[in-house]
Amino acid sequence: MATQAVPATAKKRIRKVFGNIHEVVQMPNLIEVQRESYEQFLRSRPADGYVSGLEKTLRSVFPIRDFAGTAELDFVQYELEDPKYDTDECRQRGMTYAAPMRVTLRLIVFEVDPDTETRSVLDIKEQDVYMGDMPLMTENGTFLINGTERVIVSQMHRSPGVLFDHDRGKTHASGKYLFAARVIPYRGSWLDFEFDAKDIVNVRIDRKRKLPVTSLLRALGDAVIEVNPDKGKFEAGDIVAISGVNRACRVKAVAGRLVTVEDPTGAIIPGGLIQTAEGEKIGHVARIRLQGMSGEDILNYFYRTQRFVRGENGWKVPFVAENWRGQKPAFDVVNADTGEVVFPAGTKISPRAANKAGKDGLETLLIPTDQIFGRYSAYDLIDESTGRIYIEAGDEVTPENLEALDKAGFDHVDLLDIDHVSTGPWIRNTLKADKVEDRDHALSEIYRVMRPGEPPTKETAEALFAGLFFDSERYDLSAVGRVKLNMRLELDAEDTVTTLRSEDILAVVKTLVDLKDGKGEIDDIDNLGNRRVRSVGELLENQYRVGLLRMERAVKERMSSVDVSTAMPNDLINAKPAVAAVREFFGSSQLSQFMDQTNPLSEVTHKRRVSALGPGGLTRERAGFEVRDVHPTHYGRICPIETPEGPNIGLINSLASFSRVNKYGFIETPYRKIVDGKVTNEVVYLSAMEEAKHTIAQANAELDSEGRFVEDLISAREAGEFLMAPRDHVTLMDVSPKQLVSVAASLIPFLENDDANRALMGSNMQRQAVPLVRAEAPFVGTGMEETVARDSGAAIAAKRSGIVDQVDATRIVVRATGAVDAGKSGVDIYTLMKFQRSNQSTCINQRPLVKVGDVVNAGDIIADGPSTEFGELALGRNVLVAFMPWNGYNYEDSILISERIVKDDVFTSIHIDEFEVMARDTKLGPEDITRDIPNVGEEALRNLDEAGIVYIGAEVEPGDILCGKITPKGESPMTPEEKLLRAIFGEKASDVRDTSLRLPPGVSGTVVDVRVFNRHGIDKDERAMAIEREEIDRLTKDREDERAILNRANYARLKEMLLGQIATAAPKGIKKGSEINEELLAEVEKREWWKFAVQDDARQADLEAVKAQYDDAVGLIVKKFEDRVEKLQRGDELPPGVLKMVKVFVAVKRKLQPGDKMAGRHGNKGVISRILPQEDMPFLEDGTPVDIVLNPLGVPSRMNVGQIFETHLGWAARGLGKQVTSALEAWREANPDAQAATPPAAVVDRLKEVYGKEYHADIEGRSTDQIVEMAGLLKNGVPMATPVFDGAREADVAEMLRRAGLDESGQVELFDGRTGDQFDRKVTVGYIYMLKLHHLVDDKIHARSIGPYSLVTQQPLGGKAQFGGQRFGEMEVWALQAYGAAYTLQEMLTVKSDDVVGRTKVYEAIVKGDDTFEAGIPESFNVLVKEMRSLGLNVELSSIEDQSDDDDGLAEAAE
């Protein structure tokens, strides 16, 4: 059958995928979180109306006004210029990759009229001010700070908003629940409401002393403003803006000129302007009275009232059916209208009876008088004429005050509807317990709590309270907080209202009281709807705001001390605080981390990490189990598997593979919509809050051809619970089975068969795998390998479609074929990184995958990086494993390996160490980098050039000199004679000492790169010049190649346009008017072609356009080249006092050796115990020795059975690969001339058989060459993919083994390599993907003879980095004491440690060949004596002989 031809760059190797579930949505880019967040911080998009975080921050601080109000500094716009150095230059020079930021500021100077206090503008000045550099993010989502790559980890913190909770009965002895509510702002004071043990509702501000909540409520309330109307009329419900109040207020009531405005907390100024929301003036404030809530207001907000009317023999009350349901009255309930008994005393009223009575027309009941005693009055009942108060709002009705009411002629009372069952008297009790009378009293109480010890005045108390929650400068809920508040309290405020309002506070208290009454649910703090993520942009925005506020204070002071009329914005601004804040954030914040660059996966994971630690977050010590635990809302948002072991477990998490962070900072995960029972391909992203009301089916639910569920009951999730739901209840469906795990966990095949703890170790250890010299993708993968390689930036993808023009090991040149934008080059040059050092000293090396002439499409992988093969992640190698014990060398997870692995460099890796030396300017003179080093023989200098720097390619050993350096020595003052001799005979060699850079112990390798940096204005040495020339040659080659490709493309286009045209102007020697043809053009040099002009005007215009474009492009290429060269020749910016710096890079080849740590992907880790000769290893029937022997006991107890499945499937993959190879070999033998041969039908059939029918079309579409190449790559094994939770089942594995012609048990007969005997039992053998981890024995092994000592204690330092010794600790001392080894113990504690004199003597004795020594006084004794003296205790050491002499002396003196 004819199929579409497969393009040349199509995958050379196909992975056979076992998954059945078709994914409808593409996985978002893995580092999108970082890039998106920083982009939103850095750049505004005026077209979309989006304001960047940076601009918001600047606008929140500006305008800055001086104290007198005579000047104002306003922000206009900001601009980020092009960065000074590109990323590669920053990496080499140790610079920060940042863009200079220019801010346009406007200084407005006012003249203030002293009488009317009106301001008029005197002068306006605008100026661009440089405000430091803003670090830029690289394409891969990292920052280059001082030349090192860093990642800003996102932080998970509590979302602003309101949270309701209780103490779980822990506070009070009775175990009753004490409910609490907390309003958390983004910044500002925290507001806590809580019940105490006496059921009084209290409030705390910023965790200070508690107050009754009614004090806070009395401080709230409305302003009654007397208005001088200008025009227009006020109506209730209007939104108005009042001068001095920094947000809109709602009009509550209007009575003539008195307007009640809701909650305008803030300083309303008499005479202030009142405007409509549209900005139209309405009137001025004449007088103002702020009135707090009265006791009546408070009670009527929280309780319903019931009116009781005096009747004969009792009180009449309206009948409300729901109040009587389930009641058992102790009296006859009588119908007030007819007098008949409706509910007899002592009978329980059923809901049905209550409803029936209502339907039968019962309206009013009569109840006995004693039934209203103990209820509470809703209002103050007062005698209007005398002012006598009979009963206050909230007071209890008693026989006495009821009698007084009777006498005063009250025929009805309004009582609060508190039944002590569904409505409790909590607020009423709080009101009665509260000693505060009115608003002023309440404000002064709040002031006393917030500022204890200061006497409050009315103004200060008012200002403090207004600033706490109602001033947008000091209190900010943020849009998120407002959205959360609206959702929880069912309010409808705009999300721009980011301060609190009275109704917010009232709604919080109302909800809290309802919780106490048993209505509603408390919140779950660990729900992801209540936790949000702060990514880079937001973290930096907060930090920058802090810097700007510091700057604002300085600017205000400067404005009042400088003559503003002559000053420019530049004179007022000092950007240091803002710049320092940014530098501090990137340099030393807990969330700015040194990027884990061990391999591509560790980079991606680091960028997707979410930490609960850091500033404003949790601390390890305080975090309990609940915070660390997996929560149902983590599903699809945060990986339940990948988290560190140890103290950070559960606090540092990884985003799940499909999740993304929305604009409010909540993590969302995608679902497919279900419409009318049919699963659609429409995908919605939902946060944890939005998901709560849905029932969600799993991704593996069975669907029919129309997309409907096959089963009636479906496994689904609803409100965090797993249940079997009827299919018509299901509203959403997961998009993919791997959406609940992170990237690292989704790379583990057969994850579903592993225990969770081991899966955790597996995902963590993949991040520690060292890139090997030869990468090999796994036989058994999961299909995620390509995504990780692409998104991590390790493998290079083509930016534009085009044709490969040139390829060598260091660069790929692609000629773009699509339409080229103006101002852009038509050539893409991809420079490959060759043997560069990563942050973890692993080696970054990229290799091209394309050939000259290949057609590439945008997005195709054109070069492999570290740990990638054919654009797929390749962290380790496939090795042949046998699970069997072998002479105890597998004890405790040890690993026995074959010598072949070492010999063939299977697990060899390259590590690059960087050493640097600086020549400084010292007090005694400058240091010098030179070959002329005192007291060093020629042998030690053999690797140095004339400048004293090691050659590239030199093999170096520990102690070898990498760079010669001499430092001037201090010396005693010289006598005049010495000075004279010095002047005559010149400098002595003895006045300098050797401070050369030498290779430290334990490192030996090859010098791969040397970089020399010189301070500006210092002469460059020969080596620096050579490096510079080399770099300029490389740039010249790039320039010439780019120009050549440009010329080729343009001249071809030009030729096409000129042919067949009539020339109206022509180069020298060509007649005008002649027709332009091939021969004519051949006579003229190409660069002369531009001189042709043609008759056709339209064509002439096109020619001119092409010429202009060509000139621009050439100009761009030349300018780029000149810029680069200028930067190279300019001196380097070095730290102060440094004249010259040399960096030497040494590559070390690390072969596998005993003590290295290895691991599989299932948490099966171990240390190499022995390397066995190949011939001694157990071997298969065909004589193949196995590569690795693992302990079978490592599987059952650890429950990571995935490794066994992997072994079997890997074994089958190898078998199938052999079958394809044998078919290919047979074809090659039959067809020696591959060009003229018939297509390899047998190979194609075999491939179809191996891959299955889904791949037939792809295989048939390939050309003979492609088939041969593809089959050749399957020699080692057929790559397979078993996606997590949707991979190969046991039956599939057995089927693959059968197809490969192997035993379905996966076990084979094995023979002992030493004797040749067969082992008693069959052994499980197969291919496992093993990784070599970064814990290499070479980095850990360490020995010391003599070395550095601590300054105070004089004991040897500790640790490999300090070249320290091994600590002989307390328990080791006990061991020597137990053995009675007194002399050994003595030397351990003295001459081998801190006996300074003794150890010198021992050294001398050893040199002389003497073997006796004497121990002296350890330095630690002297330290102890000094410490005691510092406490005022004079301790002296004297020997016994001295003591006896002194005694005699004393005796004599006494006589």
From Swiss-Prot:
InterPro entries: DNA-dir_RNA_pol_bsu_ext_1_sf, DNA-dir_RNA_pol_bsu_external_1, DNA-dir_RNA_pol_su2, DNA-dir_RNAP_su2_dom, DNA-dir_RNAP_su2_hyb_sf, RNA_pol_bsu_bac, RNA_pol_bsu_CS, RNA_pol_bsu_protrusion. The keyword GTP-binding does not apply. It is an enzyme of class 2 (transferase). It catalyses: RNA(n) + a ribonucleoside 5'-triphosphate = RNA(n+1) + diphosphate. It comes from Rhizorhabdus wittichii (strain DSM 6014 / CCUG 31198 / JCM 15750 / NBRC 105917 / EY 4224 / RW1) (Sphingomonas wittichii). Pfam families: RNA_pol_Rpb2_1, RNA_pol_Rpb2_2, RNA_pol_Rpb2_3, RNA_pol_Rpb2_45, RNA_pol_Rpb2_6, RNA_pol_Rpb2_7. The RNAP catalytic core consists of 2 alpha, 1 beta, 1 beta' and 1 omega subunit. When a sigma factor is associated with the core the holoenzyme is formed, which can initiate transcription. Its EC number is 2.7.7.6. One of its GO terms (biological process) is DNA-templated transcription. GO terms for molecular function: DNA binding; DNA-directed RNA polymerase activity; ribonucleoside binding. The keyword Protein transport does not apply. DNA-dependent RNA polymerase catalyzes the transcription of DNA into RNA using the four ribonucleoside triphosphates as substrates. One of its GO terms (cellular component) is DNA-directed RNA polymerase complex. Keywords: DNA-directed RNA polymerase, Nucleotidyltransferase, Transcription, Transferase. This is DNA-directed RNA polymerase subunit beta. Belongs to the RNA polymerase beta chain family.
